[in-house]
Amino acid sequence: MVDNRNATLSHTDIDSDADFGADASSAQPSPPGGSGTATHSQALAVLRELVGNAGADFHDGQYEAIEALVDGGRRTLVVQRTGWGKSAVYFVASLLLRRRGAGPTLIVSPLLALMRDQVAAAARAGVRAVAINSANQLEWDTVREQLAADQVDVLLVSPERLTNPSFRENQLPELIRRTGLLVIDEAHCISDWGHDFRPDYRRIADLIEQLPGSVPVLATTATANSRVVHDIEEQLGAGVLTIRGALGRDSLRLGVLTLPDARQRLGWLLTHLSDLPGSGIIYTLTVSAAEDTARLLAEAGHEVLSYTGRTDPADRERAEQLLKDNQVKALVATSALGMGFDKPDLGFVVHLGAPSSPVAYYQQVGRAGRGAANADVLLLPGSEDRDIWQYFATASMPSEEKAAAVLTALAEAGSAVSTVALEARVDLRRTPLELLLKVLSVDGAVERVGGGWRSTRRPWVYDAERYQRIAEARVDEQDSMIIYQDTAGCRMEYITSVLDDETAHACGRCDNCAGQWFPADVAADATNAAGQTLSRAGGVLEARLQWPSGMDRLGVPVKGKIKPPEALSEGRVLARLTDLGWGGALRTIFAAGAEDRPVDPAMLQACVKVLREWGTGDSRTAGWSGGGRPAAIVSIPSRSKPQLVDSLARGISDIGRIPYLGALQLAHGGPTGSRGGNSAYRLAGVWDRVVVGPELEAALNSIQGQSVMLIDDLADSRWTLTVAGRALRQAGAGAVLPLVLAQAG
């Protein structure tokens, strides 16, 4: 039986203590029955130590949760807006429980950055907090010693630790025996209905079952609709106390500005970024968009940095600190700048393209205005957003066919198989394979052991109906973002209603409630500058250096490093499919069902410009990647775009006055497989299927070992290029220099 209560928040002007509690002058009274008790007095004293404010008091609902944990030993779910102070609940409860003789609190959190911040925050209140995660392995022994000596009040671990065999066998049993409070941070990750589902979180349900019934459990999240809340409640067990607060953010002023194209959107940023309040975040949908936008703004004199999944961890931490210290105007970021980043005075969030779900959007805009009375939030949607959502839409659930293949491969192996070795037996890329293994592990079909994974031989039934419903829910979320852009009603009310907030109401501040608050003009010089950035073409196409492991199992006689005499040189690509500039035109060309036609003259000229710059070289590499000007051009035949490839090769040949020797030949029916398979299977699918024919071999002999330019339309795994380059080199070509129109990703 679920005890479901709604706690309405106090919406007040809050200071830098907003993440923990409110100033006494603005706080709501503590719940009846709590104020005046010994627990309340003790909890309030700890809160004030935590925030360093002798006048601080609880936000509405905070003490109710603390009391449920400390006095009631309850299993409690807190769903409250960002900045409400969920961490204050578990830090205060932890210290009170420790004073009553309980063991240390175990906090499961997916966020390394948040762990750093929380350890520092806990220390301010005398809470001895330590962490075990992938970033501090050198400290693990010290942490174990501190735990053994009972010198730790709070231990933070990543969910991945719970699946580590050594941790599970050597540390977890003792932790379970001694734990005084279990905290599940970002609990929406536990639900496969959630926008950020992580299979490792499903291990927590097993952990909860192993805890003594007297140990309280707290789950916290800011982003959960009713379906996700119900899923979390089921996994917490019976008798859950759910405290749901209002999700509306009075400090945020929302708006949507629809502009004709990417050039205008970037031009708007160039024109108006300096007028936005304080410092903030500009979110983009792709890595290339973040990097291009940051470069454009920096060249115009704005203090900005890019922040993506490709950013070095040390550079990420530095960028976060610069933003916190207001040393930059903005970070131009992908969703890599995610949960756990906290800057109470963040002045604005601008989205250059819409996230694919209202939940993700709410979470990202919720980083603004946590400790300020006002913050601006503006969405600049793009016509290409849905295409990008679709491009990145990867199934977070296992397909029945792939799951069966993994289970069969592990059962046949008999012993543990590493993920790398499994790639040679199952056609799945590393990331989806690891995700599938985690799902199967949580369901008990496989287990992670020393040396890799092995089958438990327990029966496993594929829940096709559930996975289909989840896939449909993802599409509904995308549709909701389109509705958000087009709605004439209050934008905050719409977002919070989608999150099933029963208290959703008109904010009176957004562009639909109070009128357009943002300028819509774009300076002509800014538009021109943006256009120049978008028209830039050319990126490095890195060559494969090593063959995948286990190729002998697939009948391909290669292993280890690719031999230099057979290797492809570094190449060039016009653009990635996700680029803001040429990416749009390329996505149209390669869209499903798109007609094959000769290369557009403007695209051909852009490729020629890329070649000129490649031939000149730069400080990093010599011209033509050190291979010398190509003496001939060869193309890879395309079954779907033959006119495109042939016209591109002939056009470059005519303009560059480089002989076009023709195309390679497809043998045995040509490459097999489809985009998305893993590296080993992709290589096996092209091996010996792209060959040098007799006429081409004779023509290659005539250039006497000089370099060859290799033309292709689309690069994904790069194994077709690698095999084609190897064949050309074995036939007598010197360096093989690939030029590709588009690269996936």
What are these regions (language model features)?
Residues 36-41, 45-50, 60, 64-89, ...:
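Helicase motor core with emphasis on the C-terminal RecA-like subdomain
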Residues 287, 311, 637-644:
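Acidic, metal-coordinating catalytic cores used for nucleic-acid/nucleotide bond scission
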Residues 92, 96, 231, 647, ...:
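Active-site signature of alpha/beta-hydrolase-fold catalytic machinery across serine-
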Residues 514, 529, 533, 722-745:
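PRPP-dependent phosphoribosyltransferase catalytic core
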Residues 252, 531-632, 642, 646, ...:
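Active-site-facing substrate-recognition patch
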Residues 328, 350, 354-363, 369-570:
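C-terminal accessory region of SF2 helicases/translocases
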Residues 367-374, 655-656, 729-733:
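Arginine/glycine-rich "motif VI" loop of SF2 helicases in the C-terminal RecA-like domain
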